[in-house]
């Protein structure tokens, strides 16, 4: 597998989080990377965080999240679905921003689609 930092989607994810009012998402501790060569069949993107033990071992006190976009899958999505994917991954970040994840009982299709619609409506209001 190969990985590369994606500045465009990093900036877009920060903008989405800000627009949706996700004040707990700290832009300086969230990045987006692309990966190539994944063998996964269904995964389009995933979110990672350095575990507390690793953070402590590395001398870091603050959590850091990375959204990984599986390039072969993500790039085939229409723009609306790409936004939905990013929102889905952002919704996994808990309000504590402490290194954990919110589970799929919260990050379900219905909630993600509601957030996507809310984001789209906010974009219309801005224009």
Model-derived features: positions:
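Metalloprotease/metallohydrolase-associated module, dominated by Zn2+-dependent proteases
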Residues: 1-80, 96-127
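Active-site recognition of the HExxH zinc-binding catalytic motif
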Residues: 84-96
